Amino acid sequence: MTTARPLTRRTLLLASASLAASGLSTLSHASAPWPSKPIRMIVPYPAGGVNDVVARMFGDLMAQSLGQPFVVENKPGAGATIGMAELVKASDAHTFAFGAISPLTLNPYLMPVAYHPLEDIQPVASVMYSPVLVLATTAFAGKTWDDVLAQARTSQGVSVATSGYGTLAHIMVEQLIRATGGNFVHVPYKGGSQLITDAAGAQFDLLLVNPFAPINALIEQGKLRVLATTGPARPASYPQLPTLGELGFDKANLVSMFGFYAPSNTPPEVVERFNQEVQRLLATSDMQQRLRKLDNTPHPMSVEDFTAAIRRDYALNGVLIEKAGIKAQ
């Protein structure tokens, strides 16, 4: 016969530790184990792109450890906001999305979205960031970042092309204008194909863009020169080049961050379990090498830190967009 003992603070602490050590294989004593069915992975970008490739890489490996397949659904359009709007409709704790943070931190200021970025979506796990390359075309005679600043102080100015109005690169241009007072002229494109063609044809001075195959090819051909990069550290591909942060332009030293997201009604236990699985994979040399081959830097973060980073970027972007007079289009 077991004699019942009164609950003491020590007993409660021991019980809590025991529950924590038991893992997160169940959401609670009364609920079914998680995951209990295939996991739906929304990628708000076209099939075959970097976001799609990375989402499938993680899905294949996490399916092995979690015991349920990942079913990828590509739902591109409207700056990835269509896919994110689809995400918030789910309430089964088995639906996630993968992509850039811009549909949460930037796009809501520039276009109508069918969700509140901070209330309807829960950041789950940061995966990686991609630096922005500051590239000079053959139209720009200078060789260094100092040459860029010197020309920006003249009436000639410096034309800076980006992949579009309201993009991260556009925000960088506005930050450079504010930091230097220089004559930087933004040249926004719609899509990448014409941008690549005009970069090869030297139709502007500078180009701000994340590294990807066509850009890398133009660099190898000598039609583009990398003057600087962005990020908390120099990317492995360009260790000899300074970041904009090193050059004294912290507010323009921006990167494209990517991660996993869930509807805000997803149980915290599930969010934490998913984050732990992502961090486990990011700690492996195989995953690190695969991401670096795609010109991305692994960037694991806790749920709390990833959430805080997104909230911070959302607030900062709102202030800058208002001051720069960037309007929704």
Regions found by a protein language model. Give the residues of each.
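Hinge/capping helix and adjacent helix->loop/strand transition within the periplasmic-binding protein
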Residues: 89-94, 109-194, 244, 257-290
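N-terminal twin-arginine translocation
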Residues: 2-14, 18-33
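C-terminal lobe and pocket-closing loops
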Residues: 129, 214-283, 315
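An extracytoplasmic/periplasmic, membrane-proximal ligand-sensing/linker region
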Residues: 36-38, 220, 246, 268-329
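Ligand-binding pocket segment of bilobal, Venus flytrap-like solute-binding proteins
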Residues: 159-165, 169-241
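N-terminal (or domain-start) structured segment
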Residues: 30-120, 165, 169, 181-208, ...
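Immediate post-signal peptide segment of exported/extracytoplasmic ligand-binding proteins
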Residues: 27-41, 91-94, 149-158, 220-223, ...
